[in-house]
């Protein structure tokens, strides 16, 4: 159904319809309220939903107010009220000025990188505290660390000389574990039984972990591993670091605890 003109009230057909100021007009009826000049969509100006030309467009006028003591008092009172409201809003919203951030893959990558950097810095501070201020105190920890690493890499070498000091009654004690090995007393064949037992003991008795991320060593006493590698002979140093051997490569050293999970 065709609408009525806002000026004359007659029906407006599509060929002569002007849709402007939320109303419908005839092209001839769309003129200035003051001078009756015909307007179009480019040169009209609307005021209270009525068309005006540029010359007769109503202009806002401002009234000058004298700075009387009463007006100054009201102005000062308004400013004080504004400050009080601002302070109330500030105290009310204090501590709430944060926004929820979506957990995107990019943010997860940045978080993972920051965790690695913090772990490296923590490791550096830990090593500096172990080295000590003087040179003599720093040498001993290095020697102890070298001894510890050698003991972790070659657990059998630390205990291998023990069978040579076993008394003559030791072969009798070891024979039931070897399922009736030849009882010939050679002095060198029978001590091999405790050596084999000691090599298998750390692998079965020590803790085993599986890597869940790839990690590249950032220091000489760390080890590199890949996702899915098995870490054996694991010992907990602190909440952030462990000590163990990568079964695939045989390397022994420190590794971050948040990169592995227990098997």
From Swiss-Prot:
Residues 148-162 have a biased composition (Polar residues). Residues 3-63 form the LIM zinc-binding domain. Keywords: Acetylation, Actin-binding, Cytoplasm, Cytoskeleton, Ion transport, LIM domain, Metal-binding, Methylation, Phosphoprotein, Repeat, SH3 domain, Transport, Zinc. It is found in: Cytoplasm, Cell cortex; Cytoplasm, Cytoskeleton. The modification N-acetylmethionine is found at residue 1. Phosphorylated. Residues 122-207 are annotated as: Disordered. One of its GO terms (biological process) is monoatomic ion transport. Its main location: cytoplasm. Nebulin repeats lie at residues 64-95, 97-131. The modification Phosphothreonine is found at residues 68, 104. GO terms for molecular function: actin filament binding; metal ion binding; monoatomic ion transmembrane transporter activity. The modification N6-acetyllysine is found at residue 42. The keyword Metal-binding applies. Residues 204-263 form the SH3 domain. The modification N6-methyllysine is found at residue 75. SMART domains: LIM (SM00132), NEBU (SM00227), SH3 (SM00326). Expressed in a wide range of tissues (but not the heart or skeletal muscle), the expression is specific for certain actin-rich cell types within these tissues. Expression is prominent in the cortical regions of ion-transporting duct cells in the pancreas, in the salivary parotid gland and in certain F-actin-rich cells in the distal tubule/collecting duct. In primary cultures of gastric fibroblasts, expression is mainly within the tips of lamellipodia and at the leading edges of membrane ruffles. One of its GO terms (cellular component) is focal adhesion. The modification Phosphoserine is found at residues 99, 118, 134. The modification N6-succinyllysine is found at residue 112. Interacts with F-actin. Interacts with ANKRD54. Interacts with KBTBD10. PANTHER family: LASP, LIM AND SH3 DOMAIN PROTEIN 1. Plays an important role in the regulation of dynamic actin-based, cytoskeletal activities. Agonist-dependent changes in LASP1 phosphorylation may also serve to regulate actin-associated ion transport activities, not only in the parietal cell but also in certain other F-actin-rich secretory epithelial cell types. This is LIM and SH3 domain protein 1.
